[in-house]
């Protein structure tokens, strides 16, 4: 686990590639409830739950990226589309053993609060983006909303996998009024989250 600012970005990419990203407890509980009546579950039922959790959404898109054939040029940009591609029973098989963020961060409550704060911000940004795109009659409403939901994914992952570093960034921002998040990330991580997303989630 990268636990110092000297950790190279490639170390992060290897960690994220080999780790199981946790999801919110409410997400796991809701999906477990659906799984009990799987024959009556639709892709939309699953999507309505997954789309409320940026961590679950990221896991879902990652799975679809793995399963897509190189001959399939159609890009899937909605959570429901991802579930349709995977199929309902295969979805529950693939995510039968979800890790829970609240359990992972039980011993570091400050990190859990930090993670949940970013999740709430991302959900609000996604909802506002969807409303604005709908008002503009944009043809890519789902894509815009998902982009907003996942915009701060790298920050969430730092809280999950390196909470000490995330707290250093938080302290630096509080001590330096007017400092941008990117500058704080560069100071602590030696790279900004945008770079991490481009390299690790491409």
Predicted regions and their residues:
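Conserved alpha-helical "signature site"
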Residues: 1-170, 174-202
């Amino acid at each position: 686990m990268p636990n110092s600012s000297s950790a190279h970005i490639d170390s992060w990419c290897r960690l994220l590639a080999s780790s199981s990203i946790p999801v919110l407890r409410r997400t796991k509980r809701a999906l477990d409830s659906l799984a009990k009546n799987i024959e009556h579950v639709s892709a939309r039922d699953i999507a309505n739950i997954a789309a409320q959790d940026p961590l679950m959404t990221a896991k879902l898109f990652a799975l679809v990226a793995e399963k897509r054939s190189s001959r399939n040029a159609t890009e899937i940009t909605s959570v429901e589309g991802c579930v349709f591609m995977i199929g309902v029973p295969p979805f529950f098989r693939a995510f039968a053993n979800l890790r829970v963020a609240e359990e992972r961060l039980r011993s570091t409550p400050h990190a859990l609060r930090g993670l949940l704060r970013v999740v709430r911000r991302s959900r609000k940004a996604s909802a506002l983006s969807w409303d604005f795109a709908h008002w503009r009659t944009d043809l890519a409403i789902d894509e815009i909303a998902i982009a907003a939901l996942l915009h701060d994914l790298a920050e969430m992952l730092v809280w999950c996998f390196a909470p000490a570093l995330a707290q250093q960034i938080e302290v630096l921002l509080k001590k330096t009024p007017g400092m941008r998040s990117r500058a704080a990330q560069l100071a602590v991580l030696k790279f900004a989250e945008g770079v991490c997303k481009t390299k690790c989630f491409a």
